[in-house]
C-alpha cells in the first residue's frame, strides 16, 4: 500500500494523466481544477493511493468539492490517511458507486453523508430529428434575461452556486434560445468540455412554458450543432428529474455513468 502526496496540481496531473484518461468524462473536473493547486497543505491537496494494481486519486482545491477518481478497494486506506493526517474533507464528488462505499466507511469516523445531487452523465452520437429554425443564438441585449433564467435554473436544481452576471456577457454566443411572447422562454448553453465532446449545460425552460415542446427544440438543435461540428454531445441530468430524463432519452442520449455530490449531514 502506498500513498503519494503531490506538492502541486501540475505534478499530480503529469503523473496521473494516463489513468485519468481511462474515463475522460469522469475526470474533467480534475483536469480543470488541478492547475489551480500551487502549494499543497491540509486543506488543498492532491493524493494517489495505490494497492497492488488498484488506485484511487483525490484532489481538493478550495472552494470546490473534494474530487475522487478510481477504485473502491482503496477507499479505506485513503480515508485512514486523510483522517490520521488531519486533512479537511467537507463535500465530495465522484462516481456514485465509489461515493456510496466512502459514505459507508465514513460512518466509522463519525461522519454522516448523503448523496445530495445524483447525476447521470449522458452522451449522444447521432442526429435523430432535424433542427428547429426558430432556435437562435443569444444576442448582447439578452444578457439580463439569460442571467435571470440562469438564476432560476440554479435554484430549481438546488445548487449552491451563486452566479455572477458579468461572466455571462463573454459567453452569450454559446446560448441557444427560443422566444415566445416577446421573451426568451427556453435556453441551453453549448459549453467546452473535453477534446471529444461539447456539453449542454444550463438547460432551462420558464415554468409557464413547460410541456409545450420548447426545450425539445432547443436541446435537439444544440445537439445537432455539436454533432455537425464533429464532436459528441454530452450532458448531466438530475436523476430526480424524470421529465428531462425522458426528453434526453427520446433524443438519442444514452446514460454512460452516474455521479453524485455527497454532502455532510450534521
Where are the predicted features?
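Conserved beta-strand-loop-alpha-helix junction that forms the acyl-donor binding cleft
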Residues: 93-99, 235-245, 261-266
Amino acid at each position: 500500500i502506498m500513498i503519494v502526496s503531490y506538492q502541486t496540481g501540475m505534478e499530480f496531473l503529469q503523473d496521473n494523466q494516463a489513468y485519468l484518461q481511462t474515463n475522460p468524462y469522469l475526470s474533467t473536473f480534475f483536469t480543470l481544477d488541478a492547475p489551480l493547486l500551487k502549494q499543497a497543505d491540509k486543506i488543498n491537496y492532491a493524493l494517489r493511493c495505490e494497492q497492488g494494481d488498484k488506485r484511487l486519486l483525490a484532489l481538493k482545491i478550495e472552494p470546490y468539492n473534494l474530487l475522487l477518481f478510481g477504485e473502491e478497494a482503496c477507499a479505506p486506506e485513503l480515508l485512514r490517511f486523510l483522517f490520521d493526517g488531519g486533512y479537511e474533507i467537507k463535500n465530495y464528488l465522484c462516481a456514485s458507486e465509489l461515493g456510496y462505499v466512502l459514505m459507508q466507511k465514513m460512518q466509522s469516523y463519525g461522519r454522516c453523508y448523503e448523496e445530495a445531487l445524483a447525476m447521470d452523465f449522458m452522451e449522444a452520437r447521432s442526429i435523430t430529428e432535424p433542427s428547429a429554425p426558430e432556435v437562435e443564438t443569444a444576442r448582447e441585449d439578452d444578457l439580463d434575461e439569460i442571467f435571470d433564467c440562469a438564476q432560476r435554473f440554479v435554484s430549481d436544481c438546488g445548487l449552491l452556486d451563486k452566479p455572477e452576471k458579468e461572466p455571462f456577457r463573454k459567453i452569450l454566443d454559446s446560448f441557444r434560445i427560443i422566444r415566445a411572447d416577446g421573451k426568451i422562454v427556453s435556453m441551453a448553453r453549448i459549453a467546452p468540455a473535453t477534446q471529444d465532446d461539447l456539453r449542454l449545460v444550463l438547460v432551462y425552460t420558464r415554468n409557464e412554458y413547460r410541456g409545450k415542446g420548447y426545450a425539445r427544440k432547443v436541446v435537439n438543435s444544440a445537439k445537432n450543432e455539436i454533432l455537425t461540428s464533429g464532436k459528441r454531445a454530452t450532458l448531466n441530468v438530475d436523476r430526480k428529474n424524470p421529465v428531462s430524463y425522458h426528453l434526453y432519452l427520446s433524443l438519442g442520449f444514452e446514460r454512460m455513468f452516474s455521479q453524485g455530490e455527497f454532502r455532510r449531514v450534521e
